[in-house]
Amino acid sequence: MGRAFEYRRAAKEKRWDKMSKLFPKLGKLITIAAKEGGADPEMNAKLRTAITNAKAQNMPKDNIDAAIKRALGKDGVVITEVNYEAKGPHGVLLFIECATDNPTRTVANVKSYINKIGGQLLQNGSLEFMFSHKAVFEFPKSHLHMDREELELVLIDAGLEELDEQEETLYVYGDYTQFGSLSSTLEELKIDVTKASLQRIANTPVEFSEEQLADIEKLIDRIEDDDDVQAVFTNIA
């Protein structure tokens, strides 16, 4: 989605009490990361990042440990990552990332949300060329203990594409394949990253009116309320 809408959503979500929904979602990401790369955070950058994000949201240690144990197969639950692509109200494009133990249930739910507003679930791959897959790191400007230009020079070698600033928060952008490299470099610089994620950013963001945005946000809120949905990306400017 466009940067402006992305920041607006982030600011809005900070005001919402979403802990009951957030912890299960964060737990699934930890489980997937541990299953892919092992249960030791020191040896698994993706898991280390997932744990950092969970701690930033005050997720209890017991919940984090339980999520890692699930990856070891101790409760028999298998979590699968699945993506869905759709067209919503006013022609907005939606890229929906999910983590689920029941893909059949998840696709039925997502389809129902889209259909209720006259939207359409698209064939997977339809929107791939409309979005760029990026690694994104966020941290307060106050966490930076070096000159910004110096930081850019160091991060360029690690895959930095853009360093952006919004309301005293710095955003580091790079290709998704450079996630590990950028993460390691930020750690080496002892920069306390408050959030790290893989995002899909619209290549050609579209402007919508406030009335249209209200309709679109209602749908996004409904989709994000689903326990299986991890993230919703759009082509909103």
From Swiss-Prot:
UniProt keyword terms in alphabetical order: Cytoplasm, DNA-binding, Transcription, Transcription regulation
GO cellular component: cytosol
This protein's record includes keyword Transcription: yes
Transmembrane segments: none
One BP term from GO: regulation of DNA-templated transcription
Disulphide linkage map: none
PANTHER family for the chain: TRANSCRIPTIONAL REGULATORY PROTEIN YEBC-RELATED, TRANSLATIONAL ACTIVATOR OF CYTOCHROME C OXIDASE 1
Name of the protein: Probable transcriptional regulatory protein WS1016
Molecular-function GO terms, alphabetical: DNA binding
Listed SUPFAM superfamilies: YebC-like (SSF75625)
Stored HAMAP family: Transcrip_reg_TACO1
Pfam families named among the record's database cross-references: TACO1_YebC_N (PF20772), Transcrip_reg (PF01709)
Keyword match Transcription: yes
